């Protein structure tokens, strides 16, 4: 029964395609010129909108792709980040993203946001004792207003970045003493018991450093989870006294702790719909036929059942081959050549396909806060959809039904449109209004496939 049904469906589609199109549905030359002029005016209006995106008043017809990037960045940053911190984040961007701005597929991290904060206040607290291996303590205050409620902390580090590599003649073992304090409250607030958390981290200085990271996830995780916006901490280093006898080792640590202000680096997972969620791409759904035993080369069936399954599959393949050979037989005489006639319907000249739309953020006057990528190609879908949409577009049967309704029953029902079907994410490195730096991965920012719907 399957073969006659397929033949009947094919015959109906064949008859529909052969049916001549009414003259009323063909646009006149004057109408075509009007349509072309309207398209040009629409394109000019789009460019006009793009050219005014940098203004203070955001247009209401802003493309959703660009609105994600523009949101909250109507003006240039009030503060500029430290040059050393910016170089570090640029290096991080190159490690995480391609030149086109898409996240690298070989990265296996589960976070999609990295934020770097420089201290908004810093002052020396205690002089220290270099002879005993204790270096001066430094008070730091970080403002985390840019961290949203949908961003969950994965990891946090104190980052020391240097203009020049710091060298040590031999490895030096040290302990970082971190004291996190409750921010001071005004006299109007109710008094509360002072909060203080002490955290020690052991590490080792080696020969050359351009930057150094100290993991502070344990003390900061409850504060970020409770949406604390001001983090007040005191940092000092204590190193083995016998290892600081060499003057170069002592001078390197002294310059690092006093002359270089550390930054706070937060690795976060943005759970909003706009963010790219790498978890789905790292854990695809396993097919039912692929069991753990099959991956190791073992069969999931006993010998008898496996043989029976092989016989059934081979018989099924023969049935499919015979059915396909019947369908491949021509339904019309070979002398009638309709290939040129069908070509205008099945393969239109302006076929639905991807087109490039390359722009630079300097055109939009966004280059003062978007650090990378410098250029963006969101791509778009444009073209005519064929009357009989094939498997190449992945369109549902409803698309063909809509075409039939438009041509045979009601012309007010629109034809299927050429629209994006798949997207890829985009990695963006941006300077926030408060001077912090953010690396973010946004979902559905670059069209990669078109379809007719």
Swiss-Prot record:
Mod. after translation: Phosphorylated; phosphorylation is critical for GDF9 function.
Subcellular localization: Secreted
Keyword Phosphoprotein (UniProt): yes
Residues making up the signal peptide according to the UniProt record: 1-27
CDD domains assigned to the protein according to its UniProt record, in alphabetical order: TGF_beta_GDF9
Subunit (UniProt): Homodimer or heterodimer (Potential). But, in contrast to other members of this family, cannot be disulfide-linked.
Family per record: Belongs to the TGF-beta family.
Protein name (record): Growth/differentiation factor 9
Lineage: Eukaryota, Metazoa, Chordata, Craniata, Vertebrata
């Amino acid at each position: 029964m399957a073969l006659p049904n397929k033949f009947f469906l094919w015959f109906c589609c064949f008859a529909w395609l052969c049916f001549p199109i009414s003259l009323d549905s063909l646009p006149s030359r004057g109408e075509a010129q009007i349509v072309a002029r309207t398209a040009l005016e629409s394109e000019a209006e789009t460019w006009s909108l793009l050219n005014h995106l940098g203004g203070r008043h955001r247009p209401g017809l802003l493309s959703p792709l660009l609105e994600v990037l523009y949101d909250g960045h109507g003006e240039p940053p009030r503060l500029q980040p430290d040059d050393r911190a910016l170089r570090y984040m640029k290096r991080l961007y190159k490690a995480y993203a391609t030149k086109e701005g898409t996240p690298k597929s070989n990265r296996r991290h589960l976070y999609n946001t990295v934020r770097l904060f420089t201290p908004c206040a810093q002052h020396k607290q205690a002089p220290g004792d270099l002879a005993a291996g204790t270096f001066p303590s430094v008070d730091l205050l970080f403002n985390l207003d840019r961290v949203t409620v949908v961003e969950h902390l994965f990891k946090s580090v104190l980052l020391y970045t240097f203009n020049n590599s710091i060298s040590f003649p031999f490895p030096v073992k040290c302990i970082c003493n971190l004291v996190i304090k409750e921010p001071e409250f005004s006299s109007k607030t109710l008094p509360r018991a002072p909060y203080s958390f002490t955290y020690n981290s052991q590490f080792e200085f080696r020969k050359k450093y351009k930057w150094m990271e100290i993991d502070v996830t344990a003390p900061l995780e409850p504060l970020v989870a409770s949406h604390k916006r001001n983090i007040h901490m005191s940092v000092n280093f204590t190193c083995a006294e016998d290892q600081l006898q060499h003057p170069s080792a002592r001078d390197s640590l002294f310059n690092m702790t006093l002359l270089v202000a550390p930054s706070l680096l937060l690795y976060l997972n943005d759970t909003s719909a706009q963010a790219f969620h790498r978890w789905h791409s790292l854990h695809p759904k396993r097919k039912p036929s692929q069991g753990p035993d099959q991956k190791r080369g073992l069969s999931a069936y006993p010998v008898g059942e496996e043989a029976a399954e092989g016989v059934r599959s081979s018989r099924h393949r023969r049935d499919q081959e015979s059915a396909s050979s019947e369908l491949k037989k021509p339904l019309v005489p070979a002398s009638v050549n309709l290939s040129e006639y069908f070509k205008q319907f099945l393969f239109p000249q302006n076929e639905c396909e991807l087109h490039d739309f390359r722009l630079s953020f300097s055109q939009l006057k966004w280059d003062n806060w978007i650090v990378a990528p410098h250029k963006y190609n969101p791509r778009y879908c444009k073209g005519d959809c064929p009357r009989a949409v094939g498997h190449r577009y992945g369109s549902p049967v409803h698309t063909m039904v809509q075409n039939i309704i438009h041509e045979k029953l009601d012309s007010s029902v629109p034809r299927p449109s050429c629209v994006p079907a798949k997207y890829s994410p985009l990695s963006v490195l941006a300077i926030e209004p408060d001077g912090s730096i953010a690396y973010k991965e946004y979902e559905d920012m670059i069209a990669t496939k078109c379809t007719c719907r």
